[in-house]
Amino acid sequence: EAYVPEGVLVPEWVRLSVEAVAFVAREDRRVDQTAGVSQRLAISLLEVVAASAERRALLHGGRPVARPLDLYQGLPAITGKLELEYEGELQGAERVAREIVQRAFGLVLPRYRLRTEPIVAHFEEGNLLTLPEGDVEEALKAMAGVPGLLEAARALAEGEAPEVLLSAGEFVLEGLVGRRKLSRGEASYQAAERPRSYGN
């Protein structure tokens, strides 16, 4: 059982995505399946996610709520539990782990049956979304500029605190990336068919 510090909230969509990481890793041909995927992968990842949420709350204030982006803080916890095949070694462990996380979000998103067409259409018009670090209200304000995004997030968060709403909105975006409806650079979300830009 993963240790989650008292007071840290891990929303269902984050918890399910953590569990899905282990499932996706077991299906990924770049992962050495003869070595197996450790049962501890999901436990280690959830502990990193919870610690990341706690650290953010200490730095910026607000409630300690786990967000999808916290899973990327856990990439070392994933790479440390995977043995890679030759192809995976060529691509690099971090890239493989990052893609596994994205596919995990994409796997979990459909279970919520959210209306995401307006969100995808917004990005297909050439718009980008960059979420500011730390400031929950500013990030929600940025999300409000994407038609349908906060509505989808509210359907998940059901009137919870702003931190939970932000976590839900991030999950919708990451789920769409995982389903290849959007792409994600280092700092921003954009339409899937645009080439990814890692230098900005």
Regions found by a protein language model. Give the residues of each.
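C-terminal engagement/docking regions of AAA+ P-loop ATPases
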Residues: 54-200
